[in-house]
Amino acid sequence: MNIEQFTAALEEKGITLSPVQLEQFETYFRMLVEWNEKMNLTSITEKEEVYLKHFYDSISASFFIDFHKVTTICDIGAGAGFPSIPLKICFPHLHVTIVDSLQKRITFLNELAKGLNLQDTTFYHDRAETFGQRKEKRESYDLVTARAVARLSVLSELCLPLVKKEGLFVALKASAADEEMQAGKKAVTVLGGEVVEKHSFVLPLEESERNIIVIEKKKQTPKKYPRKPGTPNKSPIEG
């Protein structure tokens, strides 16, 4: 996906990028590739692939959710900033918090935020399990997202405690979303959520399947969740 295709594809979805925003994406690409040489941020470094599989894919959540109605967003395990930084570029009013367990990725994100001149972005070097137990962070975000490879049952335990009541947890998944939703049903309910929508679509050009699972927070998450680091992954809430 070259820049013209990227711009046109977003235009079709009602997102018009200014010259400043296009420049931010260019800088993002440049910094990603530079920093990737000293640390492992991504295996995707070819420009057209980055624009499709990282930038466009990250922004796809906004095709189904109105981000103009969202103010605070928390991204769990964002790695090199996906999906929240591309969303922040498109929707500059967002207040973005990223939590990642690797200090070197946080170092990159801090430099990236400076390079892109982003306001209202905060990065925490922490495990999602311990971050989710911080009193001032629990139930405090309009929207929590993850584009991670962990199963939905695991992601729900890491993300739902941070979502405010009536807020959303949005999981960006590749294929196999139906099986994950089935296995994750119990976790979603126990943690106070309810699956309200699932959107399936194909990425343009390469036509690989993508799914966006939208979970609404209906009631408070019990205090014991998330459990201690490593536990959600070792023994997910499934049954």
Curated annotation (Swiss-Prot):
Keywords: Cytoplasm, Methyltransferase, rRNA processing, S-adenosyl-L-methionine, Transferase. The keyword Transferase applies. Its main location: cytoplasm. Signal peptide: none annotated. Its EC number is 2.1.1.-. Residues 216-239 are annotated as: Disordered. It is an enzyme of class 2 (transferase). One of its GO terms (molecular function) is rRNA (guanine-N7-)-methyltransferase activity. It is found in: Cytoplasm. GO terms for cellular component: cytosol. S-adenosyl-L-methionine binds at residues 77, 82, 128-129, 147. SUPFAM superfamilies: S-adenosyl-L-methionine-dependent methyltransferases (SSF53335). PANTHER family: S-ADENOSYL-L-METHIONINE-DEPENDENT METHYLTRANSFERASES SUPERFAMILY PROTEIN. HAMAP family: 16SrRNA_methyltr_G. Specifically methylates the N7 position of guanine in position 535 of 16S rRNA. Belongs to the methyltransferase superfamily. RNA methyltransferase RsmG family. This is Ribosomal RNA small subunit methyltransferase G. It comes from Bacillus pumilus (strain SAFR-032). The lineage of its organism: Bacteria, Bacillati, Bacillota, Bacilli, Bacillales.
